[in-house]
Design a protein with these regions (language model features):
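Substrate/cofactor-recognition hotspot
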Residues: 82-187
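Short, structured secondary-structure elements
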Residues: 1-114, 121
Length: 187
């Protein structure tokens, strides 16, 4: 906002800065929108929050009910809930160090990345993650409420990242910082 960044660009960075600008820390911070409720020990709980927060923020809808069942007041049904979730299913979260400090308390940036584009989304019967419906194939589909032309399967394609997008410690600035830290310890 302080840089007079357009809302469209802000949203793009919140959802996909890891692919749009994989080496730009100032833009990568925006993916914190997707990591703010990260649950290390329950991925499904975290993805429920991602689906809910993106729907509230960008569609003006609450999707709590349709995770478990079709609801007469929600414009999306249970299948559409899981189709929306399928857009986020490949995501994982990691912490990229901001300095050469190896301690666990060192400053780091929380960011998302696509770990596995082939991961399958499962519909959980009555929203129970212990009861997935193995018969249904769930694809990433834009909800019908956006019109017939929008309600189609979205292509999810791999984006080739530079090596430092995967391994930020190899970036020239990170290597220089590590060399400086080693030199300080040696002196």
């Amino acid at each position: 906002l302080n840089d007079d960044l357009g809302y469209d660009r802000m949203v793009q960075d919140m959802l996909a800065a890891d692919e749009l600008a994989p080496l730009d820390r100032s833009r990568l911070r925006a993916t914190g929108f997707l990591t703010r409720n990260f649950h290390l020990f329950n991925r499904n709980y975290w993805l429920e929050d991602v689906v809910e927060h993106t729907a509230k923020s960008f569609m003006g809808l609450t999707l709590n009910c349709c995770r478990c069942h079709n609801h007469k007041y929600d414009p999306l049904d249970q299948d559409e809930y899981y189709s929306w979730r399928a857009f986020f299913e490949p995501y994982q979260v990691r912490l990229d160090p901001l300095t050469a400090d190896p301690s666990p308390d060192a400053p780091a940036i929380s960011r998302v990345y696509d770990a596995d584009l082939d991961v399958k989304t499962q519909l959980f019967i009555r929203g129970d993650e212990k009861n997935p419906d193995a018969k249904r194939k769930i694809l990433a589909v834009v909800p019908r409420i956006f019109g017939d032309s929008a309600a189609k399967t979205a292509a999810v394609n791999e984006v080739r990242l530079p090596v430092t997008g995967w391994y930020p410690a190899l970036a020239p600035t990170a290597v220089a910082e590590a060399a400086r830290a080693i030199q300080e310890r040696a002196d």
